[in-house]
Amino acid sequence: MNDSEFHRLADQLWLTIEERLDYWDGDSDIDCEINGGVLTITFENGSKIIINRQEPLHQVWLATKQGGYHFDLKGDEWICDRSGETFWDLLEQAATQQAGETVSFR
């Protein structure tokens, strides 16, 4: 994958997250902001999830209260380089814990 393909795929990931949060109808307040290639999800309790892109490595990084995760694209899924879990699974687990209610991005 070249840099422009990486950015296209990361932009697509950001857009999907933003769209899902735009349609969020849960009880808690969840905000999403993109600034300089960094996507920040802020929860009602003040906690945050930070998602950013690491262009030199062609990775997406996810920082949550539970820890940090690095994802490589394998096929059409972003996969954690340590646990083998998908980006969506780990994001949903973290968002659910930080929101205090079930959050789904799919």
Curated annotation (Swiss-Prot):
Keyword vocabulary terms for this entry: Iron, Metal-binding
GO cellular component assignments: cytosol
One of the record's GO molecular function terms: ferrous iron binding
CDD domains listed in its UniProt record: Frataxin
Any one Gene Ontology BP term: iron-sulfur cluster assembly
InterPro entries, sorted: CyaY, Frataxin/CyaY, Frataxin/CyaY_sf, Frataxin_CS
HAMAP family named in the record: CyaY (MF_00142)
Purpose: Involved in iron-sulfur (Fe-S) cluster assembly. May act as a regulator of Fe-S biogenesis.
Family: Belongs to the frataxin family.
Record-given protein name: Iron-sulfur cluster assembly protein CyaY
Annotated gene: cyaY
